[in-house]
Design a protein with these regions (language model features):
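Short conserved segments within the C-terminal catalytic ATPase subdomain
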Residues: 30-40
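Glycine-rich ATP-lid/hinge loop adjacent to the conserved G-boxes
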Residues: 112-122
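Short conserved segment of the HATPase_c
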Residues: 99-111
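Acidic ATP/Mg2+-coordinating residue in the GHKL
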Residues: 94
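Conserved micro-motifs of the catalytic ATP-binding
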Residues: 4-9, 48-51
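Short alpha-helical Gxxx[C/S/T] motif in the catalytic ATP-binding
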Residues: 127, 131
Length: 162
């Protein structure tokens, strides 16, 4: 596991809402081509965060591409941005088959494998481990929860820019 302090960040203060909107443009096309829906729910107001935009774009890309990969025709991936007290909150929700319970405890460890019925991809490789390291290097937290309607919810909390 990489120490979060070992990551060299190039911080910039940006509006998370605007950036996420930009970063999701290519995924809108991918979702449309695979018959999936990508729904965005974000406030009209700015949510300022200090992030390494290149590394954080990778975090979003990993979470959204994982969600699209496990989906099927007609499934929906939701990206929700909110502000809760001193944190920016980014949630990526899917209605895919979900994570097998035996994998949940090791989800953010490198090379956790899991075969899930109906998924196009059954391997959890380095992606979530690297995602966690990047989020933690930004002073943030990433959490996983089961989506009550089926699927997964990944929540990233980031401190608001001072």
């Amino acid at each position: 596991r990489m120490s979060p302090s070992a990551l060299q960040l190039v911080p910039d203060t940006v509006d998370l809402v605007e950036r996420v909107r930009e970063w999701l443009i290519p995924f809108q096309l991918v979702a449309r081509e695979s018959g999936e829906r990508l729904l965005l729910s974000m406030p009209e107001t700015d949510i300022p965060v200090t992030i390494d935009t290149e590394r954080f774009a990778w975090v979003l890309s990993n979470l959204v591409s994982n969600a699209l990969r496990v989906g099927s025709v007609g499934s929906t991936v939701r990206i929700v941005i909110t502000q809760e007290e001193d944190d920016a909150v980014l949630r990526v929700e899917d209605d895919g088959p979900g994570i097998p319970p035996e994998l949940e405890a090791r989800l953010f460890e490198p090379f956790s494998h899991g075969r899930t019925a109906g998924t196009r991809e059954g391997l959890v490789g380095l992606g979530l481990a690297i995602t966690r390291d990047i989020v933690e290097a930004h002073g943030g937290v990433i959490r996983y929860a089961r989506n009550p309607g089926g699927g997964a919810i990944f929540t990233v909390l980031l401190p608001l820019a001072k």
